[in-house]
Amino acid sequence: MDRIIEKLDHGWWVVSHEQKLWLPKGELPYGEAANFDLVGQRALQIGEWQGEPVWLIQQQRRHDMGSVRQVIDLDVGLFQLAGRGVQLAEFYRSHKYCGYCGHEMYPSKTEWAMLCSHCRERYYPQIAPCIIVAIRRDDSLLLAQHTRHRNGVHTVLAGFVEVGETLEQAVAREVMEESGIKVKNLRYVTSQPWPFPQSLMTAFMAEYDSGDIVIDPKELLEANWYRYDDLPLLPPPGTVARRLIEDTVAMCRAEYE
């Protein structure tokens, strides 16, 4: 339940508007509300980090509005809370009126939801399930450079789950569509909320089964097999892609060293 922020309120401050995050001096604000001119603002506590409250304030600031990607190097738990705040702020902003009857909606007092004041329809934040998979072939990993990441970073394959599709089917389809190969021995590893814009990454490992690499040029700039001890530029630590790569490298080292 939201409330008005008072002078002595303190904690982490997620000030967000239109999927942007307020980052004075390039950092997520932490401390007393008065230090950041937040007294009197309406805020919602969205969690705790190391015993301190994490507050969401839906507000546009004139300066220092940036992407949540800028705080990706934070501790994983705090980064996830920042991402939660950005996603919730966008959810509340985009659900002011009911999609069924057009009447005004209001936030639930018991959960993250918006309720229609007329037809009683209930809306929840959208979450888009995605798969991400590290594929191994003997002592090598399949890594690709995506068209949307023209910075030299090579990563594992990923994609959105389609309607009526299992996670396993999504892995097989995405891998075939993007690289032209088939995989086998699929194994679930972990998951990670990913606020770009509202994904839930489900991470897998798989083994190469058959086929030659034929990339989808709309998705990939290039893809290739890289030996575990001779890898290109990788995604940053803290990402689920980096974990999948490091876990696969560890398995290769155990077998080949």
Swiss-Prot record:
- For this chain the motif Nudix box maps to 159-180
| Amino-acid positions noted as binding a divalent metal cation 2 in the UniProt annotation, renumbered to this chain | E174
What is the protein's name according to its record?
A: NAD-capped RNA hydrolase NudC
* Keywords on record: Hydrolase, Magnesium, Manganese, Metal-binding, NAD, Zinc
Question: What InterPro entries does the database record attribute to this sequence?
Answer: NAD-cap_RNA_hydrolase_NudC (IPR050241), NudC-like_C (IPR049734), NUDIX_hydrolase-like_dom_sf (IPR015797), NUDIX_hydrolase_CS (IPR020084), NUDIX_hydrolase_dom (IPR000086), RNA_Hydrolase_NudC (IPR022925), Znr_NADH_PPase (IPR015376)
Which residues does the annotation say bind Zn(2+)? C98, C101, C116, C119
- Tell me which cofactor or cofactors this protein depends on: Mg(2+); Mn(2+); Zn(2+)
One molecular function GO term is: magnesium ion binding
Family assignment from sequence similarity: Belongs to the Nudix hydrolase family. NudC subfamily.
What does the record give as the reaction this protein catalyses? Answer: a 5'-end NAD(+)-phospho-ribonucleoside in mRNA + H2O = a 5'-end phospho-adenosine-phospho-ribonucleoside in mRNA + beta-nicotinamide D-ribonucleotide + 2 H(+); NAD(+) + H2O = beta-nicotinamide D-ribonucleotide + AMP + 2 H(+); NADH + H2O = reduced beta-nicotinamide D-ribonucleotide + AMP + 2 H(+)
What Enzyme Commission number(s) does the record list for this chain?
3.6.1.-, 3.6.1.22
Q: Does Transcription regulation count among this protein's keywords? A: no
| Known partners and oligomeric status | Homodimer.
* GO CC, one annotated term: cytosol
The Nudix hydrolase domain, residue ranges: 125-248
| Organism of provenance | Shigella flexneri
